[in-house]
Amino acid sequence: MNDVFIIAGPTASGKSELAMLLAQKFNGVIINADSMQIYKEIPIITASPSISEKKQVDHYLYNYVSIFHSDINELNSFDNISQSKVNANYNNINLQQSITKHLTDRRYSVAQYVQEACKIIRSVIHALKLPIVVGGSGMYIKALVYGIHHIPEITCEIRMQVQDLYKKLTKQEFYQKLIDLDPISKNYIHSSDAQRMIRAYEVALQTNKSIFSYHNSKLVSPLECYNVKKIILLPDRQLLYQNCNQRFAKLATNGELVDEITKIKPYYDHISISAKKALGINEIISYLNQELTIEEAITIAQQKIRQYAKRQLTWFRNQTINGYTLHYQSMSELYKAQVNDVFFN
């Protein structure tokens, strides 16, 4: 058995539900490929698998990276979301313990994700189970399927130095400093993209090279020795928007979501830039600050989620992931689709 299944598509397209069905039917294990569902303090707002779902099927790379910077290490008021235990048949290896320990002063990278996903895939296949990779983060999926350009590890000192500089300057001032240090980045990075600006500055400061100079190396697929089968979910746009609206409205009226955000709100300034991009988090905080009503917060968040889903839909339509694309007008149509034929033929 050498198969690896990948289920990709926009948010609220039914990926997780389909993965659960396949995992239960074919002795599978689900591996996350969503850049927001890695965070351990915000499982609800990121629509991570529930505890019940994790008990039914083993899930990995969910809710295990902290949203906080190193200067909040002393805080211990947050409960970790427990991961499913690895079956004893997995060659007596506890995958969660074998995963690289991520200190909160290190930004989680795509390269780290690929390394850890591959480690789990190898162990799952060794245990004669089926790895099912599920997610909507194109950068994770593309890197896992086609490989990633390797960039030198950035030291904690450089990271802290750049973070401090970014906090002191306006975005435009920081952008200008980046262009002075790395003129090539002007062609690829916009001044509104804080995360990419910081990353490019770190690389240029440490290596004296542009981050884009590393993009000339040949890519090698981390999964080249496996039989990788990909399915891309492309629902009707109106169905997708309806799913987005309904899911967030349901989450926002659940007291657990408000509790989750209330818990992290006092430490908002310590949350990483990446984690702050979790859809809905800022709107719920505005509600807690009495700047918005809950209805206004829901409406604004829903609009942003729909816009994000639209961008994902466009990305998956245009990218050459070379998978089977499944178009559907309703969720029942998705669940009735003969995906078995796609994966096993």
Curated annotation (Swiss-Prot):
Reactions this protein catalyses: adenosine(37) in tRNA + dimethylallyl diphosphate = N(6)-dimethylallyladenosine(37) in tRNA + diphosphate
Cofactor requirements of the protein: Mg(2+)
Binding-site residues, substrate: T11, A12, S13, G14, K15, S16
Molecular function GO terms recorded: ATP binding; tRNA dimethylallyltransferase activity
EC number: 2.5.1.75
Annotated residues for binding of ATP: G9, P10, T11, A12, S13, G14, K15, S16
Site (Interaction with substrate tRNA): S137, R159
Residue segments, region Interaction with substrate tRNA: 34-37, 195-199
Keywords (A to Z) from UniProt: ATP-binding, Magnesium, Nucleotide-binding, Transferase, tRNA processing
Gene Ontology BP terms: tRNA modification
Main enzyme class: transferase
Biological role stated in the UniProt entry: Catalyzes the transfer of a dimethylallyl group onto the adenine at position 37 in tRNAs that read codons beginning with uridine, leading to the formation of N6-(dimethylallyl)adenosine (i(6)A).
PANTHER family: TRNA DIMETHYLALLYLTRANSFERASE (PTHR11088:SF60)
Subunit-structure text: Monomer.
The family this protein is said to belong to: Belongs to the IPP transferase family.
Protein name: tRNA dimethylallyltransferase
